Every structure is written in C-alpha cells, then in structure tokens.
Amino acid sequence: SWKGQDLFIEAIKLVKIELGYEAFHAVILGNDQGRDLYKKKLIRLTEQYGLTNQIKFIDHCEDMALAYKVSDIVVSASIEPEAFGRVAVEAQSMEKLIIASNIGGSNETIIDEKTGFLFKSGDAESLSKKIIHGLTMDETSINLMGKEGRSNIIKKFNVEKMCFSTYSEYK
C-alpha cells in the first residue's frame, strides 16, 4: 500500500537486529479499508520476521490525541507523495518526534533534523537509521525537537495565514 506499512515492518526488522527486541514496541494504526489481503500480508511479514512481540495492529482509534500523546516517535512511511501529509502536521502539533519519507507534503512541513527526520522514500534501511537515531536520542533533545515542531506548525498553519493564502490563490 502507498502508506508504506510493509516498508515500516522491514525497517523495524532492521531496528530489532541493531537494538534488540526489548528496546521498542511499534503500533500500526488504521483499518485496512477493505484491503483484507494486504493486512494479512502485513501480519504474515510480522510473523516471518519474528516481530509479533514488537508490532501490534490497531484497526481504529477513537482518540487520536491520546494515541499521539502515548507515542514516543511517529512514523509516516508513505511511498507515494501525499499532497499535505496530515500525520506529520498532527505529530508536530502534539510535540512528537516525526519521521517521514522525503516526498510530498512532508518536505514542506518538516524541517529535517530540526522538527523531525526525513528518510529516503522507499528505503527501509534509511528509515531504520532514522528510527534508531530517534530511539537513542536523549530526552532533552527529543523534547526540544518536539517543541520546534509545534512552533513550526503554529507558524505555518495558523488560521489567519491559511485564510490569506487561500484568498490570494483565488484573487
């Protein structure tokens, strides 16, 4: 799928090899939107790589704010460009460390190495290195990056600025 869940699983396999299995847990959040075969493929991949203790699948979340709050790192592994990239914006607004592919909207919303990390789209090794970097950062650096991310989003996406930009387009 274009969301890159299979790429994420490949990257987590590499993270496990590097850091060990007790260093992290990952959640793949969101329903399969009728793509039952794809979800079964993801589950098989997780089993094949011995990641069933690290990766959990959650179909639906009623409280995304809480999901972000309990996360240390948020990953958007899209392999096709997203026009906006809502996950990256939401994660930054919640002061979370975001790791996203270097295509589409993420290039506009994330300042690499300052408000989050961008990895080479479609490259599991590149993604795994960013995840490892995020998992091994000290808490002060993670918090600072989160605050920078929130500040970045507030500057770029306040209502007044968005209205002016929209008005300017139609003018």
Language model region names:
Residues 126, 133, 140-156, 162-168:
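A short, well-ordered alpha-helix in the C-terminal region of glycosyltransferases
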Residues 34-39, 52-61, 67, 117-118:
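Active-site donor-binding acidic/aromatic loop of nucleotide-activated sugar
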Residues 69-83, 96:
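Acidic donor-binding loop of glycosyltransferase active sites
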Residues 25-52:
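Short, structured helix-loop element that forms part of the nucleotide-activated donor/catalytic region
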Residues 97-100, 110:
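Short hydrophobic beta-strand element within catalytic cores of glycosyltransferases
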Residues 112-113, 117-124, 133-139:
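Conserved acidic donor-binding segment of nucleotide-sugar-dependent glycosyltransferases
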Residues 1-16, 40, 125:
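A conserved mid-protein helix/loop that constitutes part of the nucleotide-sugar donor-binding site
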Residues 57-71, 93, 111:
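Short acidic alpha-helix that forms the nucleotide-activated donor recognition element
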